[in-house]
């Protein structure tokens, strides 16, 4: 799968570099670093950008990298349209977005753009300031509506139960369970073997308590 790695530029390069290494990029993948328009006039931002370019050229020589200036002073919606076209000009199967650095307005702009994109997995990664840990969120899952039946079936699948066993426990027909699984597969919550994906586990954890409260 071809990856498009995007990141927001701040005063330090360490967050971008650490995320790049974790992402496991290889030949055929691409990198876009979004920087505020006029970033070259700021010594810290320019130094961070130059360091990123130098390290990428050394450890990922076969990967195309681009620094795209983001106009934070212009029309917000028009800039979303422009940057979305920049992203869609690339060929990729998934997006990894490192949003650990940069101005809040820049991060908001990039998140807004990512929310308008459909058709491929998008993972947002944010690292703690002390570098002790990082958070990864499958953005697509946040756009999937809550469905109590989906939560139930996902929990059964996570425990290793078959369609027939789930049908027996829930008193829903095997055909209904299979249809629910097919629906969830369209949202990448389960794979072809009816195993939960990363998105599926995230969905269950995010809505499990909501489901339990509604049941009680």
Segments and roles (model prediction):
Residues 1-94, 108-111, 115-216:
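Long, low-complexity, Lys/Arg-enriched
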Residues 93-101:
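Short N-terminal targeting/anchoring amphipathic segment
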Residues 104:
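Polyanion-engaging groove/track-forming segments
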